[in-house]
Amino acid sequence: MEINREDFEESIVNIGRVTKVVKGGRRFRFTALVVVGNKKGTIGFGAGKAKEVPDAIKKAVDNAFKNLSKVSIKGTTIAHDIEHKYNASRILLKPASEGTGVIAGGAVRPVLELAGIKDVLTKSIGSNNPGTLVRATVEALGRLKG
């Protein structure tokens, strides 16, 4: 599958900072979680770690392009209800009528918007960890039957 990176938009879902205390002070490292999508049914997510934020974001974007997946979209919404669990995060996605918009919070919204879904109702249950929520959402979208 030949991809043109210019067709894709990216959204930074989360940037985290971890600190290592050493003799000379504190050493910071950054993690970035990024979602990429072309708003036409192709979506990917990736994580990156580096000593500087821009480097972490670049690594995350590169990883996101390495694991792209197709999503089945029916008009402006999804074909049917679906519930998916990944680790402690559970996500429930329901189709919505046109004009409803994306009713989603936190890390779920950028995934759905970049996939090209315009009308959907969602509920996240359990852990609100951005990484597991994004993965649960992408896996749920991948399980949709056309």
Curated annotation (Swiss-Prot):
GO terms for biological process: translation. Residues 8-71 form the S5 DRBM domain. GO terms for molecular function: rRNA binding; structural constituent of ribosome. Keywords: Ribonucleoprotein, Ribosomal protein, RNA-binding, rRNA-binding. InterPro entries: Ribosomal_Su5_D2-typ_SF (IPR020568), Ribosomal_uS5 (IPR000851), Ribosomal_uS5_bac-type (IPR005712), Ribosomal_uS5_C (IPR005324), Ribosomal_uS5_N (IPR013810), Ribosomal_uS5_N_CS (IPR018192), Ribsml_uS5_D2-typ_fold_subgr (IPR014721). It holds the Pfam family Ribosomal_S5_C. PROSITE patterns: RIBOSOMAL_S5, S5_DSRBD. It comes from the Bacteria. One of its GO terms (cellular component) is small ribosomal subunit. The N-terminal domain interacts with the head of the 30S subunit; the C-terminal domain interacts with the body and contacts protein S4. The interaction surface between S4 and S5 is involved in control of translational fidelity. With S4 and S12 plays an important role in translational accuracy. Located at the back of the 30S subunit body where it stabilizes the conformation of the head with respect to the body. Part of the 30S ribosomal subunit. Contacts proteins S4 and S8. Belongs to the universal ribosomal protein uS5 family. This is Small ribosomal subunit protein uS5. It comes from Sulfurimonas denitrificans (strain ATCC 33889 / DSM 1251). The lineage of its organism: Bacteria, Pseudomonadati, Campylobacterota, Epsilonproteobacteria, Campylobacterales.
